[in-house]
Swiss-Prot record:
Belongs to the replication factor A protein 1 family. PANTHER family: REPLICATION FACTOR A 1, RFA1, REPLICATION PROTEIN A 70 KDA DNA-BINDING SUBUNIT A. Disruption phenotype: Normal phenotype during vegetative growth, but sterility at the reproductive stage. No formation of embryo sac in female meiocytes and abnormal chromosomal fragmentation after anaphase I in male meiocytes. CDD domains: RPA1_DBD_A, RPA1_DBD_B, RPA1_DBD_C, RPA1N. This is Replication protein A 70 kDa DNA-binding subunit A. Residues 225-307 bind DNA. The keyword Acetylation does not apply. Gene3D superfamilies: Nucleic acid-binding proteins. It comes from Oryza sativa subsp. japonica.
Amino acid sequence: MAMARLTPNGVAAALAGDTNLKPVLQIVELRGVQVNGAGVTRGERFRAVVSDGTAASSALFAAQLSDHARSGALRRGSIVQLSEYVINEVGPRRIIVILNLEVLVSECEIIGNPTALSETGSPIPNPTRVEQFNGAPQYGLMAGNSSNTTTKPSDNVPLFQNSMAGNSSNFATRPSDKVPVFQPTVQPSYRPAPNYKNHGAIMKNEAPARIIPISALNPYQGRWAIKARVTAKGDIRRYHNAKGDGKVFSFDLLDSDGGEIRVTCFNALLDRFYEVVEVGKVYVVSRGNLRPAQKNYNHLNNEWEILLENGSTVDLCPDENSSIPTQRFDFRPINEIEDAQNNAILDIIGVVTSVNPCTTIQRKNGMETQKRTMNLKDMSGRSVEVTMWGDFCNREGSQLQGMVERGIFPVLAVKAGKVSDFSGKSVGTISSTQLFINPDSAEAHSLRQWFDSGGRDASTQSISRDITPGASRNEIRKTVAQIKDEGLGMGDKPDWITVKATVIFFKNESFFYTACPNMIGDRQCNKKVTKSTNGNWTCDKCDREFEECDYRYLLQFQIQDHSGTAWVTAFQEAGQELLGCSATELNALKEREDPRFADTMLNCLFQEYLLRLKVKEESYGDERKVKNTAVKVEKVDPSGESKFLLDLISKSSALH
């Protein structure tokens, strides 16, 4: 057969660091190995011996090329052109890491008599039969159709052995008797690799490590550097374990090839780098320890993460602006979330159609946190509930609510949201979640055009069940009479409904309670305080006294529709939505006997509202009563209400 044209001295030139060369080489050996970390198998990678017909060396395929090997597109004898590769240095050894290639010939007989080139770049002397010595690496190269002869080994000795870096087991292949075989040889002591450009010895490299793509990082590298933009920066987290107290933070990096990786710093390194790292800026990061990514906390598409060490460097690139993207998304249409696994981490984008008020939730550990829900829809014909927790509620949540209330329905991109399958599918924020309002992306522009040109009125089906306070996507409309007739609130869990009704009466004698003003972290205590004999206010929860207290709504009013009347209780947020002022302001008007106090109440009477109610049976002494609590109050919008009624008529007509 005709011999394929391999690049002369291609292996030696590649090992010398000439990554501009795109050598044509042959794969003379290929095998898969399992990459393990933290006791967990991380996946299969492929190692090879590549040859230029004269010399050969070990090579490692990047993870993205594994499918080529598994499918058989790459095999022993394949001739390939390396279009992108880097050289990893592990001590004196060098390994070719292949990032991208083109298969020129899928299968071919082994060309020439390739001789193993030491991983330092120095050729190994002519092979002779020797025993393995002190576990040193052995190189065995299969010869092609050659007229050279060698002594046939005994049956007890494998004809081909290779112990490539990072694997302690040998791989043996016995060729037929007709194929000449080189026997294992002992690698000689290290000699400086020849310089193929200037024909002089290579001096010890003290220059900064060469920048490589994030996708090329692996634990077998010695010196490396990556150039990437910070896309996210976590808060400082403090912990306590058997070794004592500590602190940690992490940040995410994105490079120009789209590779992502997380970087983590502990204790003294946190003090060193926390103020240095800023979201949106580009840095060169070098000399860290690669460890298996903790997938319970790390959502990035990378099997490794970087742990910075004392010798690590993080250097700002102030002039870098456009070559590296500011963010990378992998958006999933909302209809695909229906099939996503519980706790999956994913990116979504949609138009915000509703935002509910912020509520306070008490966690199992007794700590309080903020919760806010909103509704997103996209062109897939589905909508989903997104739950914001903690600081997201008052930061992005307040901004989004203000926009929706002004009739502006923004596009929202959610990066690293967590899927929940509790009562349908929903997406919630976690500590590493990022929210982007009206991002400058093709997907966002496409959604905006769709929504403005008719998508606003397009019917959608929610993939989230309507059990959340204030949820409007699957709005459960009830009349006042149905609350009693259907036994709402009598079960183990509350019922959440929407009632269109008129406010007909206020109890204005007591419309507030005195609340604790103490701030616990970034949240107010809000527990009831009592006035002591010295005139101060005492909080039993905080065990403190205060000169002043806060006033929060505990508003009771009566509503009526065509079917009957009911009493409703509104706390701070809903009360403020109804009356248009805070409880502190309203109490001040009452104390001054200001006529505006009565006007505030009167202005709300005999007005029609949409009230989103939590209906739940509660105990009052020996008596059990159903309590209706307003979680959101809004005036009836004629346009929106007309659309709701038309949709209701349309659905009723379809059933008949």
